[in-house]
Amino acid sequence: MSKWAGIVLAGGMSSRFGEPKALASWQGSTFIEHILKLMTSALQEVVVISHSHIKERVEQLVQVPVIEDIPHYKGNGPLAGIVSGMEYIEADWYAIMPCDAPNVSHEWFTILLEQTSNNYDAVVPIINGRKQPLLAAYHNRVKEKIYALLQEEKRSMGQLLSQCNVKYIAGEDIQANADWFINVNTKEEYVQAQKDLSNE
């Protein structure tokens, strides 16, 4: 069993963005390719959770498995995506990554891995006072908790965290750059992220 695996969440509808964010251009490739390049350099196995509308297009771009949510839980947000990835790859710990945080660094996965221990169910960063449950790590044992929540039609990451023994890590304590955690939700944020990139 590989100890560490990565799950990239690319199944959202990107309604505020106006087109699939996973396929947005970034540094000569796309968000999804850029994020996978970083993750595959740090983790043994990675799977992408995609929406049926873009699955084939994503498969053409990447060299890792691309799957959809488990049919019974399809459309139940990030929890469904996470548990689908956990079922697909057997591992002890899973690093979760949304497809719309293109500033993330390879370094982040190294930091995250170092923070895990069997005493905890999850490791979640707190950046500028906000929890970041989708740029976090979850132990395999969380899978049963997710299934229980989905059975009760509960979909929020907060509900999962409330049932887990979570190690919260403050960004400033672990030398994490707040920019790594910036989500691109709108075209305006996308334009700004590209400007910031060209100014570096």
Swiss-Prot record:
It catalyses: Mo-molybdopterin + GTP + H(+) = Mo-molybdopterin guanine dinucleotide + diphosphate. Its cofactor is Mg(2+). Its main location: cytoplasm. HAMAP family: MobA. It comes from Bacillus cereus (strain Q1). Disulfide bonds: none annotated. Signal peptide: none annotated. One of its GO terms (biological process) is Mo-molybdopterin cofactor biosynthetic process. The gene is mobA. This is Probable molybdenum cofactor guanylyltransferase. The keyword Zinc does not apply. Belongs to the MobA family. The N-terminal domain determines nucleotide recognition and specific binding, while the C-terminal domain determines the specific binding to the target protein. Keywords: Cytoplasm, GTP-binding, Magnesium, Metal-binding, Molybdenum cofactor biosynthesis, Nucleotide-binding, Transferase. GTP binds at residues 9-11, 21, 69, 100. It is found in: Cytoplasm. Mg(2+) binds at residue 100. GO terms for cellular component: cytoplasm. InterPro entries: MobA-like_NTP_Trfase, Molybde_CF_guanTrfase, Nucleotide-diphossugar_trans. One of its GO terms (molecular function) is molybdenum cofactor guanylyltransferase activity. Transfers a GMP moiety from GTP to Mo-molybdopterin (Mo-MPT) cofactor (Moco or molybdenum cofactor) to form Mo-molybdopterin guanine dinucleotide (Mo-MGD) cofactor. Its EC number is 2.7.7.77.
